[in-house]
Amino acid sequence: MAPLAWMVLSSFKSSADVTAYPPTLVFPPTLGNYAHLFGTTPFLAYARNSLIVTAGSTVLGLLLGVPAAYAVSLTRVTWPALLTLAARMAPGTLFLLPWYVMFREAGLIGSYWALVLTHAVITMPVVIWVLLPSFDAIPRSVLEAAQVDGCGVLRSLWRIALPLVGPGLVVASILAFVFSWNYFLFALVLSNADTKTLIAAAFNFVGEGSTDWGALMAAATLIALPPLLLAAAVQRWLVSGLTLGAVKG
């Protein structure tokens, strides 16, 4: 909590107070950093871009990740999940150049599609690994009974499995949202002035000779608000989803 508190307090400090040493806990608060943030940047446009990219990549990541997690749980074949985890653990710079070339050849550099697709690839492994314990916790007898009654794989996923893994689905959605919302590298390289997201726009306050720490902390505070508010709103499902499948037997 200390870094978050320091970030929020610094957003209300003047430039002199932010860089003062030793740090001051008592200072005259100012809204100048927020006024500078909204006065010099199209902050609301960047927020709209972030919402479009994050919502699109979260939905796409769920559409791809939920059936994949269900298939891995149903078949007990673990290598696809291990492969996606290995891809997720690889540094983003490993994929940056080939993805940039691919999207440039497709004419998608600077478009929402480039950001949505790359962020969906980033969030899908998270969705798979969060939902695997939830699907594994469903009794096999329930799924077998659904198959006996004529439910196919997709229908049993939609009608039987998904209602039983609601908390896990909430956790997967939140984590996918947070990962996409906060991802910096591809948002910086694949966007342009019209599609730049908040996390990439905040980098504008970092200069070669100096950094506008007050405006940067104000931007960081506002960027951190949506994930925090979302997690607080669904805290009950978040806790149960994280613990689901942790204890068996």
Question: Where in the sequence are the language-model features?
Answer:
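A hydrophobic, multi-pass inner-membrane permease signature
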Residues: 1-249
